[in-house]
């Protein structure tokens, strides 16, 4: 399927979120220029998820759905979807997050108009209470911390965060998401790209909602110790790379 943007989504334990997620994604202003690649990761809710997805496929031929018999982990799912698709641009979409209807269009437009930029990202609302409509969010919602791109800022925070849009050729230059980490491989990949010369740019508008899911891979309190270890390891790895660069 010849589409400009590949939307990659790992589907696991999505009974609560899958229908509203699909309503949100298919309402994107440029959805007709996208392929939504859903990969079922041996989900306990597979039967329900499949029924809902098949329903949406009846009206959207650009929804692709495949199912794995074993969950290989989030980032291996992403890699499989990236390697199994051809779109020039890629974005990830989490089933419990939500996008402003112009989100993908705004990110795509930036990348198409600025050839020197490799990754586009935006400002997001964040809450521990779930929201389905980004365009009608309560004004008291917090903003997820982000900043204009710099190597220094990226070295201290995963700036692209939960739904950036990036050029496929980054994977040709820098490889894929590492299976070394459970929740930090996206940050490690962006650092790998940036230290290799890739450029990123912030869209300084709220174009999404990030759900601080109490059962999420990176937000479940039970995973906090592991997450801290991963963050420290990634930070120290690229701090050393930065020192070597400046020294050289």
Task: Enumerate the language-model features and the residues they cover.
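Short, well-formed alpha-helical segments that are part of the catalytic scaffolds
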Residues: 14-27
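Short aromatic/hydrophobic "clamp" motif used to bind/position activated sugar donors
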Residues: 90
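Acidic donor-binding segment of Leloir-type glycosyltransferases
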Residues: 26-66
